[in-house]
Regions:
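Alpha-helical membrane segments of multi-pass proteins
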Residues: 1-183
Length: 183
């Protein structure tokens, strides 16, 4: 299920933002200054990064995690409350809008690095724990030779792997685009 979350966050969200025609976004925001200011605040790198990190981390608290596994409606809310903040998180890197533009190349490098660091506390809890923190997985029948603890660590590695690859690709793109512009 971690792979599903990673695809929502690091593949779907950037594709949605990149695929939004700037004329549509800018035309919609043209006569809506309050909405534009509100969205400018929410898509600011600090706000978007923090909102995403807090929402994503919150769903990994054992009580919320377990509740989402037991309730289909709550699971849908979980996905939306990861996906929509992911849109805010990636907006500064991928926006084509002139009213809510992407950040500059140098800032994109720093922001992407910050995103790599932001999920370290969650990742550390999942990977360095000596026992599984999620009851459902601890009690579930094993479908592979992985123990529940090893399965949790594998999920954390998948999570961090997607985060690192995403951030490094964004940093690399920003660096080389910046270099090309300065040539």
């Amino acid at each position: 299920h971690m792979l599903q979350h990673m695809l929502l966050i690091y593949v779907s969200a950037p594709l949605i933002v990149t695929g939004l025609p700037p004329e549509l976004v800018d035309g919609f925001l043209k006569d809506r200054p309050r909405l534009t200011r509100g969205l400018a605040f929410l898509t600011h790198p600090v706000a978007g990064g923090l909102i995403f990190t807090l929402c994503f981390s919150m769903w990994h608290f054992p009580e919320l995690y377990e509740a989402a596994l037991r309730s289909r409606p709550l699971h849908v809310i979980e996905h939306w409350s990861m996906f929509l903040p992911a849109i805010l998180m990636v907006w500064p890197l991928f926006s084509l809008s002139t009213r809510l533009p992407r950040i500059g190349y140098g800032m994109a490098i720093f922001y992407s690095f910050g995103l790599m660091i932001a999920d370290l506390p969650l990742w550390a809890v999942l990977i360095f724990g000596d026992h599984p923190i999620y009851e459902t997985y601890r009690l579930a029948p094993r479908v592979s030779e992985l123990s529940a603890a090893a399965d949790m660590i594998l999920g954390a590695v998948v999570m961090k792997g997607f985060n690192e690859i995403f951030a490094l690709l964004c940093m690399g793109y920003a660096f080389f685009a910046w270099y090309q512009r300065e040539k």
